[in-house]
Structures are given as structure tokens and as C-alpha cells.
Amino acid sequence: MCKDYVYDKDIEQIAKEEQGEALKLQASTSTEVSHQQCSVPGLGEKFPTWETTKPELELLGHNPRRRRITSSFTIGLRGLINLGNTCFMNCIVQALTHTPILRDFFLSDRHRCEMPSPELCLVCEMSSLFRELYSGNPSPHVPYKLLHLVWIHARHLAGYRQQDAHEFLIAALDVLHRHCKGDDVGKAANNPNHCNCIIDQIFTGGLQSDVTCQACHGVSTTIDPCWDISLDLPGSCTSFWPMSPGRESSVNGESHIPGITTLTDCLRRFTRPEHLGSSAKIKCGSCQSYQESTKQLTMNKLPVVACFHFKRFEHSAKQRRKITTYISFPLELDMTPFMASSKESRMNGQLQLPTNSGNNENKYSLFAVVNHQGTLESGHYTSFIRHHKDQWFKCDDAVITKASIKDVLDSEGYLLFYHKQVLEHESEKVKEMNTQAY
């Protein structure tokens, strides 16, 4: 036997029926399960919320000692079995399950399924996955159910072919976003501008596009939701330029060595005004004539979790290749210069560092890095995740090993995940540090 993991629909149906019969027998001898209990898709297992009894409260009162998180704390570190070229999925799952605010949401049992078929709900499966990974079980988990649901809801990812981790991330966020609201809520679930689900609260930012007429200098502004920022790299077919030639500098804590491109360089290029040229004239809304224009992208609204995607895979009519250029990225990132509200980011397309370094609202901390080793045709995905304070681990499917900060920062980098250092609660407009995560 090849010992490969397979998904069998008939066997799962039998398991569901047997589990259902067992639950009926259990229900006949115990109290009825509340309507607020959470259903685990696939097996129909129900977990009641814990309501403390008087004896339990007395026991807790006599044992007030709190559990301390030490350097050897490993709950949440659990490998994932590769089901056949599924490393692209495993590395994203590790990044998502170590996203502090998303972890807190699922482990506090906040999800209430609104899907007509809960067994097809990807949010329910993610909730189950969080419980599995934080159960303390050290043996690798087999995410067969997650893979099956991905195949159902994102058919372009079905099969055992090699897939792209970035493509999986966007597809997963899209399905999670839709399933948070159920399938019958119409346009609201398809428009992130009118959604307040957990996915949009965490991952959605606002990308502002300003098109300026070269004749009358009228500006047309649009703001689009985004879940990530895709950045061009030097060596690609698109034009790129050194941002600080022949001069050492320090931006966002990055050590800028001549010849080394940084994440800040890529963001500078992303937010630099672009001349659209005579072949792309548009009708100006102010002067009502077709004129040449410039376009500039900035961040109108920053997400709680910022994901940066380096365009390492290039597809053209002539060739398909991987760009292996090393990009230096920092542990802490200040996005203030790239905000639409920062006038400095618009001055001749050149980045000006903010004078007020005490503003922490736009500062981020790195917590996950996804890497791709190998070629475009034959490669493998791994991830680095920040587990507790400055402790980093490398997740390579079922194998998890300790890593140093140097290992993380020296890695090639394909996807970078940053978490806001300061969260603002809209209800009370109170800002507080996310001390639990950082």
C-alpha cells in the first residue's frame, strides 16, 4: 500500500450516520443540547458551552494559581500532514492559525453558523481546525476535511497538482468571508464595503487610487477594498529602479545596503506616481477633455493584518520563471509614509520619513513569513511563525523546528504577514496595545 491519505465520501457518510446514532443514545440519558452549541461539520459532534457549577467554583477558589506561559510553551505548535502537494495549503493554515486576533476569535467560540448546510461551512471547519491545533496534541493533524471543502468551494484549486500559496490565501479569505454571512444574504456578502464579518474586520484595507489630470490638475479618487498588496521585484519585466543608490540608510529598521532591495523600496515603488502616457488618455471629470494623467496608489485605510505578496512568479508569452531576488524586510514596519493622509508620500513621488515617530497607530509587527523553495515547476512551501514573543518556529508540513530571528530575516520571502501593534475599538474609540500578542 502507498499509505497516501485519501478522502472517501461514502466512508464519511457512514461515519456521520454512526455518530448520529451515538448522539441520539447519549441524548436520551443526558440533558438536551442548547441551540447555542457549536456544530463540528462532518461528524455532527456538538460541544456545549461550559457553565460552571457551584462545586466547580469552590474548587477554582481554592486553587487560584494561574498557568504561566514559559519559553517551553508549545500549545498551538502542531504539524500538518501533506496530503499530496498540499504544502501550499499547510503554510497558509499555519499563518492564519497564528494570527493573534483571528486565533482569539475562534478559540473564544464566537462563530455562529448561518449556512443552510453547516457541513459545507469553511468557517466551521476553521473553527474546528483551531481547536485541533491548540488542543495540546503533539501528533501532526490531517487536514483532509479542509482540503475537501477547498476543492468544493474553490474548484480551480481542486486536485493534487502544485498550487500557489498566495492564490490559496485569497481564495480561502473569499470563501470564509462569504460563509461568515451565509449563502442567502445576497449582495451584502459579495461587497466587502458593506460587510462587518471577522475576515473583513481583520484583513480588509482600503486602497486609494488618485488619477490627476495633467492639464487642469483635477483629481479623480477611487477607494477599493484589498486583502493584500502585491509588490513588483527588481529583475521582473516591469521597470524597477534603485531607491537609494550608492547610499546607506535606515528605513523601518531595515539595514539598507547598496544593491539590496528592501520592503520599503517595494512600497515606495508601489505608491510612486505613474505617468499613464499619451496612449492611455482619459476624460477628465473637471475639464471634460481627454488628457494625459498620472496615477498614484496609497493606503486609505490600513487593515489589522497586512499581507504583502512579492511577485516572484512571472508568466509571459515567452517564458515562465521564478524571481529569486532577495528582499530585506523588517520585524517592525511603519506604514505612515504610504498613507493617503501623508502628504510626504506625494512629494515628487519620493518617500519622506514622518517627523513624528511617536505615532504607533500605523506600526506593525511581523508574525509570519511564507517561503517557496525550488523552481516554478517543482517547489515546496514552508512558513516561519511567531509563537510567543520573539520565539520563531519553522513549519515544514508535519515537521516543526525552532528557528532564529536571523533565519526568518535571511529567508527569501514570498508572503509577509504583519499585525498592527495598536488596535482601536470602534465602539468606544479607545486605543490599547495588543499586549496579549506582543
UniProtKB/Swiss-Prot annotation:
Recorded consequence of changing C87A: Abolished deubiquitinase activity; impaired ability to mediate deubiquitination of CGAS
Transmembrane spans: none
Active site as annotated: C87 (nucleophile), H380 (proton acceptor)
Record-level Gene Ontology MF annotations: cysteine-type deubiquitinase activity; cysteine-type endopeptidase activity; K48-linked deubiquitinase activity; K63-linked deubiquitinase activity
SUPFAM superfamilies on file: Cysteine proteinases
EC numbers, comma separated: 3.4.19.12
Keywords assigned: Cytoplasm, Disease variant, Hydrolase, Immunity, Innate immunity, Intellectual disability, Nucleus, Protease, Thiol protease, Ubl conjugation pathway
Gene Ontology terms describing biological process: defense response to virus; innate immune response; positive regulation of apoptotic process; positive regulation of type I interferon-mediated signaling pathway; protein deubiquitination; protein K48-linked deubiquitination; protein K63-linked deubiquitination; protein stabilization
Impact reported for H380A: Abolished deubiquitinase activity; impaired ability to mediate deubiquitination of RIGI
Function recorded in the entry: Deubiquitinase involved in innate antiviral immunity by mediating deubiquitination of CGAS and RIGI. Negatively regulates RIGI by mediating 'Lys-63'-linked deubiquitination of RIGI, inhibiting type I interferon signaling. Also regulates 'Lys-63'-linked ubiquitination level of MDA5/IFIH1. Acts as a positive regulator of the cGAS-STING pathway by catalyzing 'Lys-48'-linked deubiquitination of CGAS, thereby promoting its stabilization. Can reduce the levels of BCL2L11/BIM ubiquitination and stabilize BCL2L11 in response to the RAF-MAPK-degradation signal.
Subunit structure: Interacts with phosphorylated BCL2L11 isoform BIMEL; this interaction leads to BCL2L11 deubiquitination and stabilization.
Protein name per its UniProtKB record: Ubiquitin carboxyl-terminal hydrolase 27
